[in-house]
Regions:
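Thiamine diphosphate
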Residues: 1-167
Length: 167
């Protein structure tokens, strides 16, 4: 499938999970997903300047009764660790983190970034899942959202190039 078709499947999975509020930071590999989110009438979409501001925005939306997701690259996740710790983890705010896994297998440009992503997620005590197969999109996104709601914590889904349909 091409990136636009893959983006449609990912956004359908987000909708199926019951999420209605999505904050995003532009990223080259996630551009098709973000465009689909922007055009989805069932979402309140908030474009961001920095990823960590999305943590506070999603926390506020959750406290107002919304189900939230934050879309970013793993470099942005690393920038957001303090905000995640002092907001979502401390105050038990579930947010679905959809993170492009730069530096994963076959991604030559970001090997160092890829090597620290999972250890950083683990250090925060955030559960995470690596999404590599298109046929697991709905199950993984919906399951991660259920886990976030039940645990009252953020849950991360790492999106690989193969799932995004990008090179």
């Amino acid at each position: 499938m091409n990136p636009e078709q893959q983006a449609s499947r990912i956004v359908a999975g987000i909708k199926k999970a019951g999420i209605d509020f999505v904050a995003t930071l532009p990223d080259e590999k996630m551009v098709d997903v973000i465009r689909k989110v922007e055009n989805e009438p069932g979402f309140r979409h908030i474009p961001l300047c920095r990823e960590e501001e999305g943590i506070g925005i999603c926390a506020g939306a959750y406290l107002a009764g919304r189900k939230t997701a934050l879309i970013m690259q793993n470099a942005g996740f690393l920038n957001s660790c303090n905000a995640l710790t002092t907001t979502c983890l401390q105050f038990q705010i579930p947010t679905l983190l959809l993170i492009y896994y730069a530096g994963d297998i076959g991604d030559r440009g970001f090997t160092t970034l890829g090597s620290v992503t999972e250890p950083a997620i683990q250090a925060l005590g955030i559960r995470y899942y690596i999404l590599r197969r298109t046929d697991e999109i709905d199950e993984t996104i919906c399951g991660a959202q259920v886990l976030a709601e039940d645990s009252k914590k953020p849950v991360a889904v790492l999106l690989t190039k193969s799932v995004l349909g990008v090179k």
